Amino acid sequence: MAATAQPDLVVRPLLRKDLDKALDVWVSAWQTAYPSIDFEKRRDWAAEHIADLEQDGALPSVAVRDSAIVGLLVVDPNTGYLDQIVVATACQGQGVANALLAHAQHLCPNGLDLHVNQDNARAIRFYQKHGFVVTGPDVNARSGAPVHKMSWRP
């Protein structure tokens, strides 16, 4: 099931052959958001994390434009948990995240829940623009960073 936001952008399931390029996007997006952290060192963790989530029912997807992977989505339709939306740095602000979120909403029509770092103002604005509300504070179990719990309901 593919969702399109623009004629030249397709969201489709992540294939094993896509993983390295999808992880390149993951590293670059997080590196842009948090330049003081070396996300390349977290690449193997990200690959294992995505595989674990997929084994538990998550559906990783990629946004593809002109045969290049420009975004990554990891969402679990069974729980409505949105684990990741990341967009290649060069493609940010071009509707890729909108397409990925629309795909997540299509897969989870009853609603989505997520955690977002409290200091990630750009992501918080993006989610609020799309109808998400902050439902409470939490702490990232891996990093100890304060996060917001956010939810979207149709």
Indicate where each model-derived feature is located.
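Acetyl-CoA-dependent GNAT
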Residues: 13-90, 101-103, 107, 140
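Conserved GNAT acetyl-CoA-binding A-motif
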Residues: 107-119
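Short glycine/proline-centered loop/turn elements that form peptide/ligand docking sites
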Residues: 97, 101, 119-123, 140-146
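Conserved N-terminal entry element of GNAT/NAT acetyltransferase domains
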Residues: 1-17, 152
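Short hydrophobic/aromatic beta-strand or adjacent loop that forms the aromatic wall/cage
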Residues: 58, 145-150
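Active-site acidic-Proline motif in GNAT/NAT acetyltransferases
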Residues: 88-94, 118-119
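Conserved acetyl-CoA-binding loop of GNAT-fold acetyltransferases
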Residues: 128-137
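Conserved acetyl-CoA-binding loop-helix of GNAT-fold acetyltransferases
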Residues: 93-106, 125, 129
